[in-house]
């Protein structure tokens, strides 16, 4: 019998300076499955990047990935940016309990 754990991924609203992004307040997924974390940034300008960070309990923020127009992938995650750049999705390909954190979507130059 396979035990399926739930991974709770907490997201925050806005950015540190401006409320240029909106995200769901929280979401969860089954362990081992992909977690798709959406972010809306409808007022993004042409030279602003989308950055994703996460903060695990009692630790400082950790950089995950960033992109301008193209989709990006690294060893931690993938970033899908829509063609009009008004929204993006961070994809954690195989979420585990270690991925439980507060995730920040930030738009900046």
Curated annotation (Swiss-Prot):
Protein name: T cell receptor alpha variable 26-1
GO cellular component, one term: T cell receptor complex
Classification via InterPro entries: Ig-like_dom, Ig-like_dom_sf, Ig-like_fold, Ig_V-set, TCR_complex_component
Source organism superkingdom: Eukaryota
Cleaved signal peptide residues: 1-19
Keyword check for Cell inner membrane: no
Annotated source species: Homo sapiens
Key words, A-Z: Adaptive immunity, Cell membrane, Disulfide bond, Glycoprotein, Immunity, Immunoglobulin domain, Membrane, Receptor, Signal, T cell receptor
Compartments, record wording: Cell membrane
Glycan-linked positions: 40, 71
Residue ranges occupied by any Ig-like domain in the UniProt entry: 20-109
Record GO biological process: adaptive immune response; response to bacterium
